[in-house]
Each structure stands twice: as structure tokens, then as C-alpha cells.
UniProtKB/Swiss-Prot annotation:
Assembly mode: Homodimer.
A single BP term in Gene Ontology: geranyl diphosphate biosynthetic process
Keywords, comma-separated and alphabetical: Isoprene biosynthesis, Magnesium, Metal-binding, Transferase
Pathway: Isoprenoid biosynthesis; geranyl diphosphate biosynthesis; geranyl diphosphate from dimethylallyl diphosphate and isopentenyl diphosphate: step 1/1; Isoprenoid biosynthesis; farnesyl diphosphate biosynthesis; farnesyl diphosphate from geranyl diphosphate and isopentenyl diphosphate: step 1/1; Isoprenoid biosynthesis; geranylgeranyl diphosphate biosynthesis; geranylgeranyl diphosphate from farnesyl diphosphate and isopentenyl diphosphate: step 1/1
GO molecular function: metal ion binding; prenyltransferase activity
EC number in record: 2.5.1.29, 2.5.1.1, 2.5.1.10
Residues annotated as site: Plays an important role in controlling prenyl chain elongation: 87-88
Cleavable signal peptide: none
Protein name: Geranylgeranyl pyrophosphate synthase
Family: Belongs to the FPP/GGPP synthase family.
Binding-site residues for Mg(2+) 1, renumbered to this chain: 92, 98
Cited Gene3D superfamilies: Farnesyl Diphosphate Synthase
Cofactor info, note text: Binds 2 Mg(2+) ions per subunit.
Length: 302
């Protein structure tokens, strides 16, 4: 993994990720206390606290702090983003969707609690995420409202759900164009990654032009993230991924490597990340975490 290059000299991404992940894990654990009915809270916590990179909340915190905000201002939203991401994983793993048995190295939610409880756990995490953002202390209400609107767009038919629908409709087809693939992933994966970054900026009180700049950064890393995901589905093992490998090929899904080959896919991901990093140059060293996170996305192994 690249932890520093010409863009981030002297900045240790490994140390930053470890510190931020520890903070996020503690906040997530405190965000969701088990009460009645016990089963649903246990199911929610099972997937929410199952580990993972915590990339989305960390992006939110990094963007907020880069623009002069504090971690406290963004923490509720950071946790909410992970709740929404976890919901999408629970539902994505269901037999009606991707039908997966393994997630983050553990049995998927429906394998432990059954399909009915898994669906409800995802629903509950989604609704609680919006409540949790709304309960953020010491942040102006108009900023929270902007974040809630963007979250709704990112997770609904304009975003994640819309991308998933086109993904399902494209399964088994051999004539899927790269434009369709881009639509799927800018909505299914990229929309939530984008709001991670823009929400952090908004919470810090960013100007509209700063939010727009960070939106472009996030769009680039979001697409790069998915290209790398497609490559890893072919090249990595289930142990490395923490989930079943080769699922795209098995489901006859069109991927970037199937259209471009692995070498061109890697080059495209590198290009997108370079553009993302270049867009942050006005922020100097304050942007080191976001620059290094972009590098991490294209160099990760899972």
C-alpha cells in the first residue's frame, strides 16, 4: 500500500487510518445500544460492528477537518454513512440480490438471523441514520438539512437504488456499454462516496464552490474505487477480500476488466486518482489525508 508519495510527503496514511478507525469504531459502538426488541438491535450491531475499512466515515471526517471543521461536528454523520453503507451490504447479500454467504470474513446477516430479520435490520439502520444526523449537536440546522437532502438523494432512486436496479437489469447481458457501467457505479457506489466527502465539507461550513470541488474529487475516487473492486474480484482470494471472490463472473456481470482488460482498467483507475489529487492542490498539506486516501483506493488489496 502506498502511504506517501510526492503529494503527501511525511504523512503516514497507515497511522492516520489506524487512529481514525479506532475513533470511528468507538463512536459506532456507542451509537447503537441494544434495547427491546433485542433481536433487531443485535442484528443491526452484528453487521454495523463487523469491521471493514471504515473508509466512508473517515472520508467524511477528513473533508470536514480539511475545511476547518472538527471531528465532533462530523461524527454523527460519519456514523450515519457507515449505517447506510452497512444497510446496502445487508440487502446486497440477500438471495434476491447477490446471494452471498460471506461478508467482512463473517457469515452474512441473513445467514445468521434469517432473511426476514436481515431485511428489517437494513431498514432500521437506514432510518436510524437520518435520525442520527438530525441529532448532531452544535452544528447549524441549515447545514444538517443540506446533508440530509444529499443523503436521501445518494441512497434513493437517484443514487444507490437506481444504480442497483440498472445493475440487476444488466445481468447476463453481453452488450452492456461502458456508459451503462459508469451509470451503475456512479450511482450504486459513487453516490454514497460523494456524499461522504461533500457532507463533511458542508458540516464545516464550506462555500458552494468548495463543495463542488470536493464533489469532483469524490466522483473520481468513487469510479476508481469500483474499477479496483472489479479487478480485485478477479485477482484476489476470498480470504483477502473478506467476501466471496469471483461473484461478478459467476453472475455474468459486465465489469471494467471484462470490457477493457485488467491493464487498461488499472490505468484508468490511476488516471482518475491523479485527477482527484490534483483537484486538492489549493488546500496544500491540509489535504494530505484526502490525497493519501485517494492513493489508498487504487493501491488497496481488499
Amino acid at each position: 500500500m502506498v502511504v506517501a508519495d510526492a503529494h503527501t510527503q511525511g504523512f503516514s496514511l497507515a497511522q492516520y487510518l489506524q487512529e481514525q478507525k479506532t475513533i470511528v469504531e468507538t463512536a459506532l459502538d456507542q451509537s447503537l445500544v441494544i434495547t427491546e426488541p433485542v433481536t433487531i438491535y443485535e442484528a443491526m450491531r452484528y453487521s454495523l460492528l463487523a469491521g471493514g475499512k471504515r473508509l466512508r466515515p473517515i472520508l467524511c471526517l477528513a473533508a470536514c477537518e480539511m475545511l476547518g471543521g472538527t471531528a465532533a461536528m462530523a461524527m454523527n454523520t460519519a456514523c450515519a454513512l457507515e449505517m447506510i453503507h452497512t444497510m446496502s451490504l445487508i440487502h446486497d447479500d440477500l438471495p434476491a440480490m447477490d446471494n452471498d454467504d460471506l461478508r467482512r470474513g463473517k457469515p452474512t446477516n441473513h445467514k445468521v438471523y434469517g432473511e426476514d430479520i436481515a431485511i428489517l435490520a437494513g431498514d432500521a439502520l437506514l432510518s436510524y441514520a437520518f435520525e442520527y444526523v438530525a441529532r448532531t449537536p452544535d452544528v447549524p440546522a441549515e447545514r444538517l438539512l443540506q446533508v440530509i437532502v444529499r443523503l436521501g438523494q445518494a441512497v434513493g432512486a437517484e443514487g444507490l437504488v437506481g444504480g442497483q436496479v440498472v445493475d440487476l437489469e444488466s445481468e447476463g447481458k453481453t452488450d452492456v456499454a461502458v456508459e451503462t457501467l459508469n451509470f451503475i457505479h456512479t450511482h450504486k457506489t459513487g453516490a454514497l462516496l460523494e456524499v461522504c466527502v461533500t457532507a463533511g465539507a458542508i458540516l464545516a461550513g464550506a462555500k458552494p464552490e468548495e463543495v463542488q470541488l470536493l464533489s469532483r474529487y469524490a466522483q473520481n475516487i468513487g469510479l476508481a474505487f469500483q474499477i479496483v473492486d472489479d479487478i480485485l474480484d478477479i485477482t484476489a482470494t476470498a480470504e483477502e477480500l473478506g467476501k466471496t471472490a469471483g461473484k461478478d463472473l459467476e453472475a455474468q456481470k459486465v465489469t471494467y476488466p471484462s470490457l477493457w482488460g485488467i491493464e487498461k482498467s488499472q490505468a484508468e483507475a490511476q488516471k482518475l486518482v491523479a485527477e482527484a489529487i490534483a483537484s486538492l492542490e489549493p488546500y496544500g498539506e491540509k489535504a494530505n489525508p484526502l490525497k493519501a486516501l485517494a492513493e489508498y483506493i487504487v493501491n488497496r488489496k481488499n
